[in-house]
């Protein structure tokens, strides 16, 4: 009886058979690291070994997060192990979200309502009629000085010229007054105010206070400063409580050397009443 010949496959067939089987993935956990090894074919139909190393960290999370990790997976991931599957899950950076309820959205003011609260123009500033500064005329620091006096004299002359041209009778009590305004009374501060000039550009209010506090109580002190730099303009006004103290300050400080400069101290000239 003839013996059947043993079949021997060629090496090419063996290669094709080997390509159809891939080693199973392996997972090793040691020294706080999880090493996952997988095999697959690339685009050139070559077997590729992929090794992923994960660092295991233990964190304290809330109960809701811990409970969510125990949920059973479903669909194509029903047979996956606990935790993210690298084949289907990509771990990226944390994204923080802020949820706004409909109630908060309804309470948010519209842009149209805010437009009415905005100033009409960012270039609009206050302009003083006395010194042309960026403040209200009512709060002008020069309203009792020579600048205000010159402004008042010019306004009075303009009013007199207007009255002379109209040929109307003007009561003596109203003669020389600015139309629409009453004549301001003489302030008690005017007779106790002194003007200190030729000050250093680096002088501050504390320096002026040190100069005059030895002569008597001071009611008000003003140091003129540059708007852009904040440096002293070279002069200041001091209002004493008593005129006798102001006179002593003028006598002592006028011609006095201070900060390598000679001070000029005189009475502050209030506006004259017409």
UniProtKB/Swiss-Prot annotation:
Gene3D superfamilies hit by this protein: 3.30.70.330
This entry's Gene Ontology molecular function terms read:
RNA binding; translation initiation factor activity
Can you give the residue ranges of the RRM domain? 192-270
Q: Cytoplasm as a keyword?
A: yes
Major localization class:
cytoplasm
> Which parts of the chain span the membrane according to its record?
none
| Compartments (UniProt record) | Cytoplasm
| Single GO BP term | formation of cytoplasmic translation initiation complex
Classification via InterPro entries: eIF3_g (IPR017334), eIF3g_N (IPR024675), eIF3G_RRM (IPR034240), Nucleotide-bd_a/b_plait_sf (IPR012677), RBD_domain_sf (IPR035979), RRM_dom (IPR000504)
Keywords carried by this UniProt record: Cytoplasm, Initiation factor, Protein biosynthesis, RNA-binding
**PROSITE patterns, per the entry:** RRM
Q: Name one GO cellular component term.
A: eukaryotic 48S preinitiation complex
- Subunit structure of this entry? Component of the eukaryotic translation initiation factor 3 (eIF-3) complex.
Q: Which family does it belong to?
A: Belongs to the eIF-3 subunit G family.
UniProt xrefs under HAMAP family: eIF3g
Write out the function statement from the record.
RNA-binding component of the eukaryotic translation initiation factor 3 (eIF-3) complex, which is involved in protein synthesis of a specialized repertoire of mRNAs and, together with other initiation factors, stimulates binding of mRNA and methionyl-tRNAi to the 40S ribosome. The eIF-3 complex specifically targets and initiates translation of a subset of mRNAs involved in cell proliferation. This subunit can bind 18S rRNA.
Q: Which PANTHER family match?
A: EUKARYOTIC TRANSLATION INITIATION FACTOR 3 SUBUNIT G (PTHR10352)
Name of the protein = Eukaryotic translation initiation factor 3 subunit G
The organism's taxonomy opens as: Eukaryota, Metazoa, Ecdysozoa, Arthropoda, Hexapoda
């Amino acid at each position: 009886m003839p013996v059947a010949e043993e079949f021997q496959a060629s090496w090419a067939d063996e290669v094709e058979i080997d390509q159809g089987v891939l080693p199973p993935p392996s997972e090793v956990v040691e020294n706080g690291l999880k090493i996952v090894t997988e095999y697959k074919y690339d685009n050139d139909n070559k077997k590729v070994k992929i090794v992923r190393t994960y660092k295991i960290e233990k964190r304290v999370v809330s109960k809701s997060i811990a409970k969510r990790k125990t949920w059973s997976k479903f669909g194509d991931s029903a047979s996956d192990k606990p935790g993210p599957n690298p084949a289907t899950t990509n771990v990226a950076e944390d994204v923080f979200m802020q949820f706004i309820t409909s109630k908060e959205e309804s309470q948010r003011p519209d842009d149209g309502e805010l437009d009415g609260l905005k100033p009409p123009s960012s270039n609009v500033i206050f302009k003083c009629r006395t010194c042309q500064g960026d403040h209200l005329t009512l709060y002008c620091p020069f309203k009792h000085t020579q600048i205000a006096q010159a402004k008042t004299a010019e306004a009075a002359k303009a009013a007199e010229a207007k009255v002379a041209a109209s040929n109307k009778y003007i009561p003596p009590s109203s003669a020389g007054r600015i139309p629409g305004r009453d004549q301001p009374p003489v302030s008690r501060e005017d007779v106790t105010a002194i003007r200190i000039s030729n000050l250093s550009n680096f002088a501050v209010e504390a320096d002026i206070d040190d100069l005059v506090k030895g002569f008597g109580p001071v009611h008000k002190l003003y140091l003129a400063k540059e708007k852009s730099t904040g440096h002293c303009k070279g002069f200041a006004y001091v209002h004493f409580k008593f005129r006798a103290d102001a006179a002593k300050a003028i006598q002592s400080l006028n011609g006095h050397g201070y900060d390598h400069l000679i001070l000029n101290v005189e009475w502050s000239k209030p506006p004259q009443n017409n």
